[in-house]
Amino acid sequence: MGTKCYSKLRYVVVLVLLLFVFPCSLSQSAPSSVTGRRLMGIYMPNGGIIAGSSPSGQAPNINNNYHGRRLMISEARPSKSKKGGGREPESPG
């Protein structure tokens, strides 16, 4: 009978410790709006999409001169290889 009470006491002690530790850890964690981490990228009209938060938790400084990592380029440029691949320009006549 003594071992039965001891095993129940062990479960009660573990339960009390979990009830004490779990709320303390929740109160110390800050929401994403406070830490500055973003889940989505930032769209810039002339520059594509800038990637969101980095794995280290330090988001890049965003200003007008910062272009970040480009995920999408929104402008088409002519080929520099001169090998074609596009349409021939139509003659005006």
From Swiss-Prot:
Its main location: membrane. Coiled coil: none annotated. Keywords: Apoplast, Cell membrane, Cleavage on pair of basic residues, Membrane, Repeat, Secreted, Signal. Mostly expressed in seedlings shoots, and, to a lower extent, in roots. GO terms for biological process: response to herbivore; response to insect; response to wounding. It is found in: Cell membrane; Secreted, Extracellular space, Apoplast. A motif (SxS motif essential for MIK2 binding) lies at residues 54-56, 79-81. Induction: Accumulates upon infection by generalist herbivores such as Spodoptera littoralis. Induced by wounding. Belongs to the serine rich endogenous peptide (SCOOP) phytocytokine family. Brassicaceae-specific phytocytokine (plant endogenous peptide released into the apoplast) perceived by MIK2 in a BAK1/SERK3 and SERK4 coreceptors-dependent manner, that modulates various physiological and antimicrobial processes including growth prevention and reactive oxygen species (ROS) response regulation. Inhibits root growth. This is Serine rich endogenous peptide 6.
